[in-house]
Design a protein with these regions (language model features):
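C-terminal segment of classical bacterial N-terminal signal peptides
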Residues: 14-21
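Positively charged n-region of N-terminal signal peptides that target proteins for export
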Residues: 1-4
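A generic structural signal for well-ordered alpha-helical surface patches
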Residues: 9, 113-117, 130-133, 166
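Long, amphipathic alpha-helical surface segments
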Residues: 21-61, 71-104, 125-175
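Bacterial N-terminal signal peptides
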Residues: 8-14
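Alpha-helical scaffolds flanking conserved acidic
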Residues: 45-49, 109-117
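Structural recognition of the beta-strand scaffold that forms the well-ordered cores
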Residues: 66-68, 114-119, 144-146
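Short alpha-helix boundary/capping elements
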Residues: 120-124
Length: 175
């Protein structure tokens, strides 16, 4: 299953650059040309940031006490109810928060990005009690099933969360 996901991500990133693709046949002025890069070319930290942005989206004032890309406002922080962060402010806050989660799981080396992405969404308390962390601590790298099991909301399996876990696993897990 893991190999199938990795193959899917690789194929998806290649399709946009194929010569027979309709998008590659249209003429685009030089000033508008942008090089398409695969997410897999980016460092793990940047991959995680893009994935979190895609699934969290920029929160609006009605989502209080969440601001930016899913940051939960803590007592003593200067954010006020009804505030809307700019893209730049939200990005900076996301990077700061995600860096803290990466620091929590620093001792897990290359797995810290995957664990930090899960902690950003579920909270470090959930991750610290999870079978994912237990398996990694025991040296077992077969964590696909355990990782993708974190896709429930209010007791029910949530398709969007499953998609998020599959995307995170495909982009951030290094065998």
């Amino acid at each position: 299953m893991k190999k199938l996901l990795i193959l899917f991500v690789a194929l998806f990133s290649i399709v946009g650059t194929m010569p027979g693709n309709a998008a590659s046949q249209r003429t685009v002025p030089a000033r508008e040309q942008k090089t398409k890069r695969s997410i897999m070319e980016l460092p793990l930290f940047e991959r995680a940031i893009l994935i979190i942005k895609k699934f969290e989206t920029l929160h609006k004032p009605k989502h209080w006490p969440y601001v930016g890309y899913g940051h939960q406002v803590q007592p003593g922080e200067s954010y006020r109810r009804g505030c809307q962060l700019t893209e730049a402010q939200a990005d900076a806050l996301l990077r700061k928060d995600y860096s803290k989660f990466c620091a929590l799981y620093e001792k897990y080396g290359k797995d810290k990005y995957l664990l930090a992405a899960l902690a950003y969404n579920c909270g470090p308390g959930v991750v610290n009690k999870s079978s994912v962390l237990r398996l990694l601590k025991s040296g077992n790298r077969n964590i696909f099933k355990a990782y993708t099991s974190h896709c429930h909301y209010k007791g029910k399996k949530h398709k969007g969360l499953l998609t998020r876990r599959l995307t995170e696993f495909a982009a951030l897990f290094i065998p």
